[in-house]
């Protein structure tokens, strides 16, 4: 690419500075038949098969956030830290290659094994799960949706008896175990919806919490902004404007990281140049 032509390629830099750790991020990697194929997040979601397991039974869908870009960054971050730790004992840096495609292919391991073992791809079911029931979003009275994911028969027993209010459902042959519940998903979902629609969102959340049933609310960006668990921090832009953004996810006992202001274009260019003189 342009950096190599200018003499700033990763290999060139490590030749001059053997302890340097470099990381190249590309769409499909430095080798292979797709190495020169242009790549965007959406395109890689489709090429990797991620879009094929996302969406409804009628149509595949793009994941709503740029998962390829984000995953590539996280993979690069972890690999750079690994190389830095290795350098502490070896004294040498390393060259790292991360691609959007490899990151998503790694995510598809379970789907690929499903294809190999069952001879068919995982069934696409929106917010539901092809192998677990009940699992999905259910509307409640007054608006909103509750999502549940019953993981075992013991949890189903508490849910059926204490939330749905019908102990007979526990021993009902249609719902006696997960396989039966998956087979009779339609009948089971109808029962759940009928009960859930009798409650408003806050009342049902309290009942589920009291009964130790795992649940969530189907939130949008506005609801996330108002979430009581959400942490935010101020961030100063180059023009002096201050935005409230979501805080970094990792927290340390020694104290949370303090973010400095967003740098202006070229603000640290000279400082970086001096490091390589």
Specify the residue positions occupied by each region the protein language model found.
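Active-site-adjacent "lid/gating" segments in soluble enzymes
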Residues: 4-150
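Aromatic-enriched alpha-helical interface/lid elements that frame and gate functional surfaces
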Residues: 134-211, 215
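Short acidic-hydrophobic surface loop/beta-edge motif
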Residues: 136-141, 233-239
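Alpha-helical scaffold segments in soluble metabolic enzymes
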Residues: 76-83, 158, 162, 271
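Conserved PLP cofactor-binding pocket of PLP-dependent enzymes
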Residues: 209-232
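Short, surface-exposed loop/helix-turn segments at secondary-structure junctions
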Residues: 115-123, 227-238
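Flexible, small-/acidic-enriched active-site or ligand-binding loops
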Residues: 235-277
């Amino acid at each position: 690419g342009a950096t190599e032509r200018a003499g700033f390629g990763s290999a060139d830099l490590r030749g001059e500075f053997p302890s340097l750790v470099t990381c190249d991020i590309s769409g499909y990697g430095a080798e292979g038949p797709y190495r020169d194929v242009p790549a965007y997040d959406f395109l890689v979601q489709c090429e990797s098969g991620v879009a094929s397991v996302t969406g409804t039974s009628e149509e595949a869908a793009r994941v709503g956030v740029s998962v390829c870009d984000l995953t590539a960054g996280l993979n690069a971050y972890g690999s750079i830290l690994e190389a830095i730790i290795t350098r502490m004992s070896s004294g040498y840096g390393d060259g790292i290659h991360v691609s959007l495609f490899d990151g998503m292919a790694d995510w598809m391991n379970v789907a690929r094994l499903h294809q190999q073992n069952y001879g068919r791809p995982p069934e696409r079911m929106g917010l539901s799960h092809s192998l677990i029931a009940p699992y999905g979003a259910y509307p409640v009275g007054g608006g909103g949706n509750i999502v549940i994911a019953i993981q075992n028969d013991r949890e189903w027993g508490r849910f059926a008896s204490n939330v749905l209010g019908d102990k007979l459902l526990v021993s009902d042959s249609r719902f006696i175990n997960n396989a039966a519940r998956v087979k009779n998903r339609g009948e089971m979902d109808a029962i759940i919806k009928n009960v859930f629609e009798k409650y408003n969102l806050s009342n049902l959340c309290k009942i589920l919490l009291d009964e130790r049933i795992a649940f969530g609310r189907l939130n949008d960006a506005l609801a996330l902004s108002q979430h009581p668990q959400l942490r935010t921090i101020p961030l100063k832009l180059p023009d002096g404007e201050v935005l409230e953004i979501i805080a970094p996810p990792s927290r340390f006992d020694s104290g949370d990281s303090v973010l400095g202001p967003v740098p202006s274009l070229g603000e640290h260019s000279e400082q970086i140049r001096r490091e390589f003189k």
